[in-house]
């Protein structure tokens, strides 16, 4: 009972190397540990590539997700987007120009791979959020304007949990609506038998 977490964390990892996992080995892990969810949270290390075109990353990460689905059949995949990151432009800290294009690419490959998606950039406040997280007291992020500190990590986790829980509550409501039997309409003199709605 409870939650068991395996954390595959490598400094400087873009997420692409996990596409080389050995399928047989991963399935052996899965048969013993029976994973329910894989969370992919990458991005900060891709922002420094000097490009605003992330079509290449979108395509390659879509292949990574497909590979993970082979490694761990039936396991749900959640993609958490890159958080905000600030860079100095003309002596002023601003959201890095690459954050939104990368975020959009991550959302697209999540949709294409039928994975769940949480937009961390939006959840933490969108444009300029990292500046606020660094400069407010007590600070929630480090002076590199990239990484959360322990307070920010806790808040980020809370934001993701809240988003997932709200989605789950919405799912339960929609399930209830779908389970309700459709009321049959009795025909009477008012209803025209052959029109766009009731055509037989």
Q: Where do the model's predicted regions map?
A:
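Hydrophobic/aromatic beta-strand patches that form the interior of the parallel beta-sheet core
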Residues: 6, 78, 116-118
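Catalytic His-Asp segment of secreted/periplasmic serine-dependent ester chemistry enzymes
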Residues: 84-200
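Generic structural signal for well-ordered alpha-helices
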Residues: 61-66, 103, 107
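Structural beta-sheet core signal
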Residues: 40, 79-80
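Conserved SGNH/GDSL esterase-like catalytic core that processes O-acyl groups on lipids
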Residues: 1-63, 70, 147-148, 190-199
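Histidine- and/or cysteine-centered catalytic micro-motif in compact active-site loops
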Residues: 43-44, 82-84
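A short helix->loop->beta-strand "cap" motif at the edges of active sites that frequently abuts
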Residues: 72-76
